[in-house]
A protein has these predicted regions:
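A charge-rich, low-complexity, intrinsically flexible signal that marks solvent-exposed coils, linkers
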Residues: 1-35
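Extracellular/periplasmic envelope-modification machinery, especially enzymes
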Residues: 38-314
Length: 314
């Protein structure tokens, strides 16, 4: 019955020598043991179920706020503004961007104001989605963008088994559409740089260019979007003081593609980077809404240069 003390000499629990405390402890212990022994008073499965659900909810909440360094309410107005760019995407992504299957040509979106007949077609993987919407503010166009399905003719990818059929359908549509004069090709080239993909991807992309130019189309190729490989809004805000971080530009895969005479190239690097170094912020906008897709705000700036430099058909 010694007094319980910690190494510093302070009490860490009630003194068992005190009669009232001993009675209270005994009574509480008896109540707890009685409750646990009587299976009718509780359900072990129920307790396990509720604890499991509770832990799951706590884990989900923790994962949600972990990249933000806490609740958004704790962030400065500047950081909250930067974080809002995770939603800076094309407002017609759900309707005009494909993820699977083989879309009918009737599903290709016609974007742009007025009743003018579109002369521009944007064909690409998801890196064409924001550009297509932004460009439609300057000229009416038709678009067919498909996640992880680049405009590389006869290119087969395991992640998108219908890509090869989709691309053939797009090509047939373009070859038989006399109204389309300009075809803008966009892709996240780095995504197809693996040993098993790169050769067939490059060959397929060059085949697309060949077929289009042979049919008299004006082909415009957008090169690799500067991609830091980390979520840009989260990275910029997950620090004490917001600093416009820089990263190295990588267009290794794109440089393997041979562009033929008559094909126009638009270089993002020319506007978004200085040499081989690219900032995560451009004109006070995060360049990406995630780790590789161009933010809509920056896309709206880029399309002005695309139209000016490459003389798109009105």
């Amino acid at each position: 019955n010694r007094l319980i003390r910690c190494v510093c000499g302070k009490k860490i629990g009630p003194d068992p020598r005190n009669f009232n405390q001993r009675v209270s402890l005994g009574r509480n212990d008896l109540l707890i043991r009685t409750f646990l022994r009587n299976k009718k008073t509780y359900s072990r499965k129920g307790i396990f179920k509720y604890f499991t659900v509770s832990y799951f909810i706590i884990a989900c909440c923790s994962l949600a706020i972990w990249p933000l360094n806490g609740w958004s309410g704790r962030l400065s107005p500047q950081k909250e503004n930067i974080l809002s760019f995770t939603k800076d995407i094309s407002p017609v992504r759900n309707q005009c961007h494909f993820n699977d299957g083989v879309p009918e040509t009737s599903q290709y979106c016609i974007l742009g104001q007025g009743n003018k007949i579109p002369h521009v077609f944007v064909w690409g993987d998801s890196h064409g989605a924001e550009i297509a919407y932004a460009l439609s503010s300057l000229t009416p166009l038709v678009t067919a963008t498909y996640s992880a399905c680049p405009p590389a003719y006869a290119f087969n990818t395991e992640s998108r088994p219908d890509c090869i059929t989709h691309n053939k359908k797009v090509m047939n549509y373009l070859l038989n559409n006399k109204n389309i004069k300009d075809v803008v090709l966009a892709a996240n080239y780095n995504l197809y740089g693996s040993d098993k993909d790169i050769e067939s991807f490059v060959k397929g992309f060059e085949k697309t260019i060949e077929l289009l130019t042979r049919s008299g189309k004006h082909v415009i190729v957008l090169d690799q979007v500067p991609s830091p490989g980390v979520n840009v809004p989260y990275t910029l805000t997950n620090v004490d003081v917001v600093v416009n971080k820089e990263f190295r530009y990588n267009d290794k895969v794109f440089r393997k593609i041979k562009l033929t005479d008559g094909v126009d190239l638009f270089s993002y690097e020319k506007y978004l980077c200085a040499g081989e170094s690219c900032p995560m912020m451009y004109n006070n906008f995060p360049i990406s809404f995630d780790d590789n897709h161009l933010s809509l705000s920056v896309a709206k700036i880029m399309v002005k240069y695309i139209k000016r430099d490459l003389l798109l058909t009105e």
